[in-house]
């Protein structure tokens, strides 16, 4: 598993520890560098004609949404999942997208978050939201929590 997938997987584990397997939980993640950390490693493996060794184990992680697949497999999720690329955490988008999924019945719960990983520098900010939440789910709350 690549660094981005490990980061997302471990952060999601904390949120899903009390959730039943196969729950109707959607995943909406974003970051800035996509899968660039793994892309660079893969490019190095194919750049040298004398030492050409493309690794299928590395190649599979050259898409950022693979981390969502790892989480889905672990928790038997068969729900909506999307991975977006933004210059910075976008609380307006996250709140709107998650609320849309909840209000249209596409999911009972949504794990949203920012999982950035590049050159051993990382940040994970994930949260679980449902219609029965105790904290208002809006961009103001998200912005405040993200910047803590």
What are the functions of these language-model segments?
Residues 1-70, 74:
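Conserved beta-ketoacyl condensing-enzyme motif
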Residues 26, 107-112, 136:
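Short glycine-aspartate micro-motif
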Residues 28-31, 85, 112-116:
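Short beta-strand segments
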């Amino acid at each position: 598993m690549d660094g981005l997938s490990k980061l997302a997987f471990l952060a999601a584990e904390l949120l899903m520890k009390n959730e039943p397997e196969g729950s109707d939980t959607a995943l909406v993640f974003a970051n800035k560098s996509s899968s660039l950390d793994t892309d660079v490693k893969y490019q190095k493996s194919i750049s040298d004609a004398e030492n050409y060794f493309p690794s299928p184990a590395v190649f599979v992680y050259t898409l950022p949404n693979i981390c969502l697949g790892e989480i889905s497999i672990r928790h038997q999720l068969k729900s909506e999942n999307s991975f977006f690329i933004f210059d910075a955490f976008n609380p307006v988008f996250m709140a709107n997208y998650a609320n849309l999924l909840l209000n249209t019945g596409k999911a009972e719960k949504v794990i949203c978050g920012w999982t950035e990983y590049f050159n051993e520098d990382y940040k994970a900010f994930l949260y679980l939201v449902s219609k029965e939440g105790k904290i208002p789910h809006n961009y103001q709350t998200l912005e405040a929590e993200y910047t803590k």
